[in-house]
From Swiss-Prot:
Keyword Amino-acid biosynthesis applies: yes
EC assignment: 4.2.1.20
GO molecular function: tryptophan synthase activity
Oligomer status and interactors: Tetramer of two alpha and two beta chains.
Highest taxon of the lineage: Bacteria
Protein name as catalogued: Tryptophan synthase beta chain
UniProt-listed HAMAP family: Trp_synth_beta
Organism listed in the record: Clavibacter sepedonicus (Clavibacter michiganensis subsp. sepedonicus)
């Protein structure tokens, strides 16, 4: 199993593709051609690299967390600190690239979907930086549980549109953003937030996020003298996971683990564990694993984490799962919240609830792999946006709040 890194789409095995209305074909063709040209253009590559150095804050650090690791069977645990990026997550890596591309193709307006609000904040940030008009679609449920990020987007000058259809979460936000793009395709570029959707989005977003793994591979080698035994990341659509996995795909001795949102439990109706519980189908212009009923209709997902509350997953993850190259496991809401508190109290780092799914998974993984193992975790975002959820969950805010 070698040379997996060279597979660029539009298909990853049987997954991926481009199943869209005729009205979007020309826009996707334009985007695809522009990206193929720009990604090998030395001037574009250098401009993006310099932006990341002076604006994003790359390379991001790695941090070893020994007190947290004591709870993982003593395995050595290293975090890739995407939470330290400007705007607080990995999302800025993708957005700066797509915003630069938007300028190059001469469009003045960008739109995006967002769940946790991190992609929306990053997109609004890039729009402010480059002087672009910006509209963000966000499920009404998510605008309520991520109100801080809604305020950030509006402060940055973006229009935030709450989506009231369907389950009022990420899936529905993508639907409305797609409709906007169909209507305004001449002036508008859709800055897609994850490695899902129609080609070229899975490949392009992966290309823009793979810097995470490229940096981390060098950093872990420098710190430990060898590659990690396992690389772990949370998986919703899956961009942070592909971003850190990609550099290791052809290292057969490095195991890859994606931790999905199990919600109340993967065996309950309230889950977002797409690969664990789903089967192949069509959603948002691509074939991938989906949560669906016996009639093939996409069903609502559930997660305490807005960013993982999605009934699909990127096609490259579906392919890696079927190949056996990566393993995908569910983590419940309660397990994720417990890991969030544990990292906060043992290391002084408050992670995003999304990232806490990877932390929870790694706690179990460490016990399986033993004390000699090195586990690299993508800490994809910081937890500031989740303080209201965590405050309610742990009863931190009232007079009788938990003190121990």
């Amino acid at each position: 199993m070698t040379d997996l890194r060279s597979v660029t789409g539009p298909y990853f095995g049987e997954f991926g593709g481009r199943y869209v209305p005729e009205s979007l074909v020309a826009a996707l063709d334009e985007l695809s051609a522009a990206w193929e040209e720009l990604k090998v253009d030395p001037a574009f590559v250098e401009e993006l690299k310099e932006l990341h150095r002076t604006y994003t804050g790359r390379p991001s650090l790695i941090t070893e967390v020994p007190r947290f690791a004591e709870h993982a069977g003593g395995a050595r645990i290293i975090l890739k600190r995407e939470d330290l990026n400007h705007t607080g997550s990995h999302k800025i890596n993708n957005v700066l690239g797509q915003a630069l591309l938007t300028k190059k193709i001469g469009k003045k307006r960008i739109i995006a979907e967002t769940g946790a609000g991190q992609h929306g904040v990053a997109t609004a940030t890039a729009a402010a930086l480059f002087g672009l008009d910006c509209v963000i679609y966000m499920g009404e449920v998510d605008t309520e549980r991520q109100a801080l990020n809604v305020a950030r987007m509006r402060l940055l000058g973006a229009e935030v549109i709450p989506v009231r259809s369907g389950s009022r979460t990420l899936k529905d936000a993508i639907n409305d953003a797609m409709r906007d793009w169909v209507t305004n395709v001449e002036t508008t570029n859709y800055v897609f937030g994850t490695v899902a959707g129609p080609h070229p989005f899975p490949a392009m977003v992966r290309d823009l996020q793979k810097v995470i793994g490229e940096e981390a591979r060098e950093q872990v080698l420098a710190l430990t003298g060898r590659l990690p035994d396992a690389v772990a990341a949370c998986v919703g659509g899956g961009s942070n996971a592909i971003g850190i996995f990609h550099a290791f795909l052809d290292d057969a001795d490095v195991a890859l683990y994606g931790f999905e949102a199990g919600g109340d439990g993967a065996d309950t109706p309230r889950t977002a564990a797409t690969i664990t519980k789903g089967r192949p189908g069509m959603l948002h212009g691509a074939r991938s694993y989906l949560l669906q009923d016996e009639d093939g209709q996409t069903i609502d997902s559930h997660s305490i984490s807005a960013g993982l509350d999605y009934p699909g997953v990127g096609p490259e993850h579906s392919w890696l799962s079927d190949l056996g190259r990566a393993s995908y496991r569910p983590v419940t809401d309660d397990q994720a919240m417990s890991a969030l508190r544990l990292l906060s109290r043992t290391e002084g780092i408050i992670p995003a609830i999304e990232s806490a799914h990877a932390l929870a998974g790694a706690l179990e993984l460490g016990k399986e792999l033993g004390p000699d193992a090195i586990i690299l975790i993508n800490l994809s975002g910081r937890g500031d946006k989740d303080m209201e959820t965590a405050g309610k969950y742990f009863d931190l805010i009232d007079a009788g709040a938990e003190q121990s």
